[in-house]
Amino acid sequence: GEEQKPVRKSDKAYHAAFLRRMVFGNPIVWVLSVSNFFVYIVRFSLLDWGMMLLPHTKGISVAVAGIMVAAFEFIGGNLGMVIAGWATDRLFGSRAHRTCVFCMLGTIVMTIVFWCIPDTVSPWVMAVPFMLIAFFIYGPQALLGIAMSNQATKEASATANGILGVFGYASTLISGVGLGFIADRYGWNSIYAVILVFAVLGLLTLTTIWKAAPDGYGAAKKFTAEYERNSSR
């Protein structure tokens, strides 16, 4: 028989088939994308609406609200991303999706804590759970792109992250227009309930891939072998 030739990565038919298997037909890619949608809603709800939400629900001055929103991202968020990355490598065997599950749990707990704090408490005390929300939600915000690149492999990471980005920025339909409508109709405190709903949805979505491998290179190798066998027939 003819000698089987290894598939060339520049082969257009192979690349198209690879994208179908590792990206468009890969359930993990879609779970990560939907999770990103929920994560971005939580993040932007507090980042974009914080200047309105804090004065209306906690009686905080606009000046102090500005400081808290800045600290939300630059202190809580940046610290959360670093710790989440460390935890992924050291505690979860490079399984970023598992780190994200715990981050979403933390987000839910801290959102409840912040929501329940009475407006008589000092704003500087309130700032602690508020920054901790950022600490937890910025973990997935940073890690989901890494998880996507690992699952789609370097051959398809750009396409997969493009999908992830579309879902992330589609979240503005909720965190932008949707939240404004909800605040007008049901009051500013209802925003916390909305944030909790989407945080829980993000958690539940991520738990469906808890057992997933750290990356998709094993699946990619298997696909390439199958493609070579089929091509040689």
Predicted features along the sequence, with ranges:
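C-terminal ends and interior cores of transmembrane alpha-helices
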Residues: 105-119
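Extracytoplasmic gate region of multi-pass secondary transporters
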Residues: 26-82, 141, 145, 175-176
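Juxtamembrane intracellular "pre-TM" segments in multi-pass secondary transporters
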Residues: 1-32, 225-233
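Paired intracellular helix-loop junctions of major facilitator superfamily
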Residues: 93, 148-157
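Cytoplasmic membrane-interface "Motif A"-like loop-to-helix N-cap segments
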Residues: 89-104
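A membrane-interface helix-boundary motif in multi-pass transporters
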Residues: 95-98, 180-198
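Interfacial helix-cap and linker-helix signal at transmembrane-aqueous boundaries
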Residues: 54-55, 87-88, 92, 179-187
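A late C-terminal transmembrane helix in Major Facilitator Superfamily
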Residues: 154-185
